[in-house]
UniProtKB/Swiss-Prot annotation:
Chief site of localization: cytoplasm
Recorded superkingdom: Bacteria
One Pfam entry name: GIDA_C_1st
Gene: mnmG
Native source species: Burkholderia pseudomallei (strain 1710b)
Name of the protein this chain belongs to: tRNA uridine 5-carboxymethylaminomethyl modification enzyme MnmG
Subcellular localization: Cytoplasm
Amino acid sequence: MLYPTEFDVIVVGGGHAGTEAALASARMGAKTLLLTHNIETLGQMSCNPSIGGIGKGHLVKEVDALGGAMAAATDEGGIQFRILNSSKGPAVRATRAQADRVLYKQAIRRRLENQPNLWLFQQAVDDLMVEGDRVVGAVTQVGVRFRARAVVLTAGTFLDGKIHVGLNHYTGGRAGDPAAVSLSSRLKELNLPQGRLKTGTPPRIDGRTIDFSKLDEQPGDLDPIPVFSFLGRAEQHPQQLPCWVTHTNERTHDIIRSGLDRSPMYTGVIEGVGPRYCPSIEDKIHRFASKDSHQIFLEPEGLTTNEFYPNGISTSLPFDVQLALVHSMRGLEQAHILRPGYAIEYDYFDPRALKSSLETKAIGGLFFAGQINGTTGYEEAAAQGLLAGINAGRYAQEKDAWCPRRDQAYLGVLVDDLVTRGVSEPYRMFTSRAEYRLSLREDNADMRLTEVGRELGVVDDVRWDAFNRKRDAVSRETERLRTTWVTPKTLPADEATALLGKPIDHEYSLAELLRRPGVSYDGVCGLRGGECGPSEPLAEDELLLAQIKEQIEIGIKYQGYIERQAGEIERNGANENTRLPDGIDYTEVRGLSFEVSQKLNQFRPETIGQASRISGMTPAAISLLMVHLKKRGLGRRKGADSVPGADVQADNTAAQQ
């Protein structure tokens, strides 16, 4: 039957990508339908019970700055919070949290059920409705047809998923859930380029059978306790729990080696490529054969369960080998395994067949997000889902697509890497992937993205008001520090010596003092000489005050580096954002080699910047492209005339940093 209501956007899948996509399009005012095979698994953490980390935490902050749910749900469900790289520079500091699976899932579902313009429906999708070269809806397994202007597909590992434990295997999207076999077959009929990837998960352990007296305790940060969302509060956190650390040993490695003849990875049963940066324990002992041991983190799954997640022993070895390797480690000699580890193979589609909006180039209105694009990780999925949801909503509203640039967000880096370079293995975000990481910090994600999010319609009044208070306070106080001066007469020698190590010998602004190594904002404002402290409190809320102080310190201490990077961004920006016409035939560009023109015609980059990052492209080829565009009056800047926030982001680069 044809469902009587027509929707603007249909989102298929209720994982981290699907939930963010549905919430984003609904926040924009698009009538949105979220189709999931099981409402009870909305927002489920299928693998590790944690959010964030290096690069990943940056993505979560950006999702939050654009009104997404992941950071706020983590604050409500997080049972341990840490700042990684806290002793290093601000560019690589990152938030990571352990989450109670049940509390996190409840927080996501609560937001879905209370979001205006969003409807939920429990049914697996078996087919897409395609008319000509555009999608017009989806068909469920019982034949219900839903029509929509745009469809976002967030299928995770479910597309023709196959689960492996030793040499045994069976179809499944994850343990306990069916695979999407019919939908996978339908997508293959559409002739979209695809392949197979693989990921895995470790066995789960009953905490009552762990000897914690033999393990090293790893507590979270307590002073202060971090929060993930810019609107978060430490008071939202439930009870905090420690993690625990054990290690593999030579006996563990011998047990693993003895089972490789029954490993699906080492016997050719698994064809898909696994994640390089989250390898199975089989891969670890093979790739790092010289290492005598590997750290294993025992992470609690929640407050109301005894289940522990042993981070570091993802495996698809036979269960008897899994049991032996677990028992070989200190503290786990008597451990009971609750669930076996397994590997899962699944279909993905070459992201080079996508536009930067995450819409497929071949089928109008069809968007892909998450593991279907070859990525791995909750955070990468959530970021893509949010972008796909925004652009599906804009597509339904007949507005131009939006995507941040590489110098504006890690989300921009992620998408640009996917659509220009593709993937040969599951893609994971790192800070090292960003050229301008000093400008793309966790602390300034809101300064970079919240204003454009407001224009896109995904930032609500509460977030907007909080952002404006913070931005105004940072601007006002930074200006005060730059224009307030102290002299040897107004700053007593003993105070100067306590702060700087010696008295001052001439006039300094407070900003110049703050720029000195080891000098903090509080230290400068605590000086009695002159008018050093602010005339009024920067914020009544302690968390907001801490965020303001951090922004001020980083902005002043790293001002020279940030300005240098801003200049580099400006110099590279002209060519980077020059659009390439949709219908251009690259074989007609004089001087291009056959190989280069063939690649350009195959991958159809949207901008000169994207073209420059395609494998095999040379500076000479880019110059020929620029000459071709100039001669024919083609190409235009990607930005102000087509999407919200382009003017704002260009004009306020310094303020964002």
